[in-house]
Amino acid sequence: MKISIISFGSSPREWLGLYKKEINKIKQFKYQIEFINLSEHSQENIELKKMLETKDILQKIPKNSSCYLFTERGKTVTSKEFSQLLNFPNICFIIGGSYGVDEKLIAKSRPDIGFLSFGKLTFAHKIFKLIVLEQIYRGFSIKFNRKYHHAD
C-alpha cells in the first residue's frame, strides 16, 4: 500500500530528517510514502505555466489511486474527516507549484480528484510537505485508535 505525494522542487537537505521521521511513523500502518518531485516550468506567462505544470502532474498520478489536490479553494477538513480519506490502498496527494494548478484542467481531465484545503494560510512547500506527512500519521492514528490525536 502506498501514498504518493506529488509536488514541485526537491526537498531541502536539512528537511529530509524531519520527513524521514514522519515517514517512519507512518510505516507502522503498512503504507509506503513516495515523493514524486517535479520541476517547475520557467515560463513567465503564469496561466501557461500552471497549465504545463498541471499536465506534468496528471502524467505522474499513479494508476488506481484515490487522489486529492491541496488548493486554497478546496474543502476544509478536520483531522477526523481527513482520516476517512485514508481508506484506500493507494492514495495520491498533490501539492501544486508556486502559482497553483489549472484547476479547470484537473477537473476536466480527472473529475475523480478531490480538492482539499488545510485552511486559508499559504505555506512554503517544504513546510507543507511536513504538515501533510504529520496529518497522514495523525489520520492513521485516528483510524486505528492509537493514542496520538486528543481533540474531538
Curated annotation (Swiss-Prot):
<comment type="similarity">
    <text>Belongs to the RNA methyltransferase RlmH family.</text>
</comment>
<dbReference type="Pfam" id="PF02590">
    <property type="entry name" value="SPOUT_MTase"/>
</dbReference>
<feature type="binding site">
    <location>
        <begin position="118"/>
        <end position="123"/>
    </location>
    <ligand>
        <name>S-adenosyl-L-methionine</name>
    </ligand>
</feature>
<keyword id="KW-0949">S-adenosyl-L-methionine</keyword>
<feature type="binding site">
    <location>
        <position position="96"/>
    </location>
    <ligand>
        <name>S-adenosyl-L-methionine</name>
    </ligand>
</feature>
<keyword id="KW-0698">rRNA processing</keyword>
<keyword id="KW-0808">Transferase</keyword>
<dbReference type="InterPro" id="IPR029028">
    <property type="entry name" value="Alpha/beta_knot_MTases"/>
</dbReference>
<protein>
    <recommendedName>
        <fullName>Ribosomal RNA large subunit methyltransferase H</fullName>
        <ecNumber>2.1.1.177</ecNumber>
    </recommendedName>
</protein>
<keyword id="KW-0489">Methyltransferase</keyword>
<dbReference type="GO" id="GO:0070038">
    <property type="term" value="F:rRNA (pseudouridine-N3-)-methyltransferase activity"/>
</dbReference>
<feature type="binding site">
    <location>
        <position position="69"/>
    </location>
    <ligand>
        <name>S-adenosyl-L-methionine</name>
    </ligand>
</feature>
<comment type="function">
    <text>Specifically methylates the pseudouridine at position 1915 (m3Psi1915) in 23S rRNA.</text>
</comment>
<dbReference type="InterPro" id="IPR003742">
    <property type="entry name" value="RlmH-like"/>
</dbReference>
<dbReference type="InterPro" id="IPR029026">
    <property type="entry name" value="tRNA_m1G_MTases_N"/>
</dbReference>
<keyword id="KW-0963">Cytoplasm</keyword>
<dbReference type="GO" id="GO:0005737">
    <property type="term" value="C:cytoplasm"/>
</dbReference>
<comment type="subunit">
    <text>Homodimer.</text>
</comment>
